[in-house]
Amino acid sequence: MARDATKLEATVAKLKKHWAESAPRDMRAAFSADPGRFGRYSLCLDDLLFDWSKCRVNDETMALLKELAVAADVEGRRAAMFAGEHINNTEDRVVLHVALRDTSSKEVLVDGHNVLPDVKHVLDRMAAFADGIRSGALKGATGRKITDIVNIGIGGSDLGPVMATLALAPYHDGPRAHFVSNIDGAHIADTLSPLDPASTLIIVASKTFTTIETMTNAQTARKWVADTLGEAAVGAHFAAVSTALDKVAAFGIPEDRVFGFWDWVGGRYSVWSAIGLPVMIAVGPDNFRKFLAGAHAMDVHFRDAPLEKNLPVMLGLIGYWHRAICGYGSRAIIPYDQRLSRLPAYLQQLDMESNGKSVTLDGKPVSGPTGPVVWGEPGTNGQHAFFQLLHQGTDTIPLEFIVAAKGHEPTLDHQHEMLMANCLAQSEALMKGRTLDEARAQLQAKNLPASQVERIAPHRVFSGNRPSLTLIHDMLDPYALGRLIALYEHRVFVEAQIFGINAFDQWGVELGKELATELLPVVSGKEGASGRDASTQGLVAHLHARRKA
């Protein structure tokens, strides 16, 4: 069936009425009255558990949300994506990052062409190159083994590889990995200063080889190599992830060190492609393939499972409920895993660049809110930074906890137990809160004077009823990481279909880039600022004055 706008509008109205009149208000009471609540509002895929029972939903909520998914034709749009239809309508492109990790299909067609042999060819070339670097068969220009790799990229060419490389630190047995993204010269200067060009490989990741930040940093790195080792050494110390073979050749990188990908792979969905080359070099081709296999397992589940048993669908529906019905404008991602420290930033781009839209697929203004602000930090660090606001602030911010049952350090298992206890405690505290009577009783137990009890007790009240969901897997390994990232990719897709927007373009990135190009000669003093707004003129004048001071 196609998207049913009339039914969708009616279901949204029913959900809003339900939220106002009959959604759970007291989560303590909801759990007391329903011992089976956890079982009904949780799902498993193998060892991966998704629990949303602490969210303010009941059976009526879930029935209406499923009705919403049907009206939005989530299943039809899902099928269209997997079938290679041009669902990115503003750029007339198919959306097939799922093909990058497809190990079970015989063919995946893009405009009649089976792309799986192409995907396999690039993956095999990546593996051969990675093995060569890791083993020392591919050496630097002076014959030294490569000990460090520096990936230069930005956005999807940086966030995914950084996140995955940090997450898979226990599997690193290759060269050390470093990442440069910011055009701020401090970033590349600080990265290169402790390294030796003779044992460093630099990967330049830019599909067009024109991205300003990436190419500026790449030229700086090229000069660093050439000034030390000579111009002829450049080719032995660079590789590229790009489709612009002419520009790559002009830069001095041989074609056998260039790895391409396709326009049906969006930047924020590209870590599975050649963009993941630094990850593969760090952890090895076998572990990278396990990373792909985990994502593929989630793809198959998302494609085949019925709506009510489908983890990405249910995660997306809860996300929509929180954003569009409950009115929560923010979403906190809190992985209780230090190695997932960059996951919030990765999901921030994935979600906000995909669903930060204000017009529908047909170019009309949306009728309600779309994607939330996504942010976060690892636990337990966040508890000592911003959890005060999450517990007692005036805004309700849903939290998404992620934790593993087992850590990688058996001799430090007691610390992992403390980590898990903190994660579950925060989830419980947000839900239960603490009443005024409970706060008084706690203070009275300390034998404080009655006047002091009455003065302090209100400050120790927690409202509770603050929603959170929890994801638990056995251990953060390559397979589990791939599965987790694919879960969030498909969740974003589900929410976009209900919002009625295109999750696969990012026109909001363009205007600032265009104006930066115009302003560069103004900031550098080659052109005047006349014709620009008074604020920009004033800022330019101040910068000029301070640079001369």
Curated annotation (Swiss-Prot):
Main localization (coarse): cytoplasm
Active site (catalytic residues): 353 (proton donor), 384, 513
Annotated catalysed reactions: alpha-D-glucose 6-phosphate = beta-D-fructose 6-phosphate
GO cellular component, one term: cytosol
Enzyme Commission designation: 5.3.1.9
Signal peptide: none
Biological pathway: Carbohydrate biosynthesis; gluconeogenesis; Carbohydrate degradation; glycolysis; D-glyceraldehyde 3-phosphate and glycerone phosphate from D-glucose: step 2/4
Keywords associated with the record: Cytoplasm, Gluconeogenesis, Glycolysis, Isomerase
Pfam families: PGI
MF-aspect GO terms: carbohydrate derivative binding; glucose-6-phosphate isomerase activity; monosaccharide binding
Superkingdom of origin organism: Bacteria
Residues spanning the membrane: none
Name of the top EC class for this enzyme: isomerase
Gene Ontology biological process terms, A to Z: gluconeogenesis; glucose 6-phosphate metabolic process; glycolytic process
Location in the cell: Cytoplasm
Protein family (similarity comment): Belongs to the GPI family.
Function: Catalyzes the reversible isomerization of glucose-6-phosphate to fructose-6-phosphate.
Protein name as it appears in the record: Glucose-6-phosphate isomerase
Name of encoding gene: pgi
